[in-house]
Amino acid sequence: MGLDDSCNTGLVLGLGLSPTPNNYNHAIKKSSSTVDHRFIRLDPSLTLSLSGESYKIKTGAGAGDQICRQTSSHSGISSFSSGRVKREREISGGDGEEEAEETTERVVCSRVSDDHDDEEGVSARKKLRLTKQQSALLEDNFKLHSTLNPKQKQALARQLNLRPRQVEVWFQNRRARTKLKQTEVDCEFLKKCCETLTDENRRLQKELQDLKALKLSQPFYMHMPAATLTMCPSCERLGGGGVGGDTTAVDEETAKGAFSIVTKPRFYNPFTNPSAAC
């Protein structure tokens, strides 16, 4: 080895793909022939040695110098890429943490704002107090119109210095109260009607019981009117119709249709009894 060779010695740390020693020596021996170095099998390796000594590089071995340069370039690129990936991971991890913190802050802020809005809504509902003039005007408008269209609602809200939503809620509550009062009135009326019908039903039940008792107390026979007797013309003559020698002419149809009773005359003889002569 000459002076130039001693000056070129140094430590080399390589990380990358390098050929195995057998393939490398075989490639150096056949450097003069046309060999495509792309087909040389490359294995991952990590070496720390003097430059030129581990591979026994000779002068004029251009192929060996080219492979060493490729190995060092591969190791530099891999180290740079690994460092860049690590930095990207660190940056991405930091960004993820920052995004998570920002999301948490947004959620907390939204919850706080919602709670604040709810408190404001409750306080607004509690603070709403109508004056006598506003109440009177609302009552007058309700008597005219129980429901309002959007234009009427806007005009009334401007007149009362209120929001349209407040006017709408007041009208809704007023309609509900009116309906409740009407329901109570109807309920009282129906109660009175029910009481009246109950009394009438009780009275009718009593009358029905009285009629049933009267029907049971009546006798089972019926009273017949007294029969009228008619006399035939001969009976009338015997009874004294021929006094004075006057005779009455009787129609044949009347004599035939009349009810006649024929009786034998009975004469009492006081001398028929022998004890009577004594």
Curated annotation (Swiss-Prot):
Pfam families for this protein: HALZ, Homeodomain
Any single GO BP term: abscisic acid-activated signaling pathway
PTM-bearing positions, type Phosphoserine: S92
GO terms of molecular function: DNA-binding transcription factor activity; DNA-binding transcription factor activity, RNA polymerase II-specific; transcription cis-regulatory region binding
Localization per record: Nucleus
Function: Probable transcription factor.
Family recorded in the similarity comment: Belongs to the HD-ZIP homeobox family. Class II subfamily.
Annotated Low complexity bias: 72-82
Protein name as annotated: Homeobox-leucine zipper protein HAT22
Residue ranges the UniProt entry marks as DNA-binding: 123-182
A GO cellular component annotation in the UniProt record: nucleus
Metal-binding among keywords: no
Region ranges (Leucine-zipper): 190-211
Lineage: Eukaryota, Viridiplantae, Streptophyta, Embryophyta, Tracheophyta
Region (Disordered): 68-103
Organism: Arabidopsis thaliana
Keywords, comma-separated and alphabetical: DNA-binding, Homeobox, Nucleus, Phosphoprotein, Transcription, Transcription regulation
